[in-house]
Amino acid sequence: MLLIKHKGKLIETAGDELYAVFGLESSIREAADDSISAGLEIIDELDKLNSSYFNVYFFKEFEVGIGIHSGKVIIGELNFDGQNKSTVMGLAVNIASRIQDATKEVNNSLIVTEEVIRHSSLKEKHQSSQINLKGVTLDHSIHLLGREYRKNKS
């Protein structure tokens, strides 16, 4: 799985969304780089799957919206019916979710916040802007690392 390859951990799935965390056993710089690399590779792999399968058999394409943020969180294990489940809570999680929601608004498949860029080893410049996030008082600087959505988005 791509998340494991990039040292991420799947935390939760809900409908067509998933939540992952990076940096549990690495530096903040490695976590930022790994999360960006994972996001870019997910987009590339989905393009390949669209070309080889979904377009061929269903005449459809699927796209993703990925939001990445960095910040302090609470991480723990919860036990439900004898099964341990990792959980991550905090404002940073909420901001990441809002950033993911904003991918449609800004028409870009991968958005990362300024905090992630600052911690990463990325040197090249990317399109950036300010965005107001629902439920968050301050605007956030975001960087668009993905691509525009196709018009026939499924």
How would you describe each model-predicted region?
Residues 1-8, 24-66, 70, 91-102:
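Alpha-helical scaffold within the catalytic cores of cyclic-nucleotide enzymes
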Residues 14, 31, 74, 88-95, ...:
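Helical mechanochemical/support elements of P-loop NTPase systems and associated helical scaffolds
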Residues 15, 99, 135:
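Residue-level signature of catalytic and energy-coupling elements of molecular machines
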Residues 73, 104-154:
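Cytosolic regulatory/linker segments at or just downstream of nucleotide-handling modules
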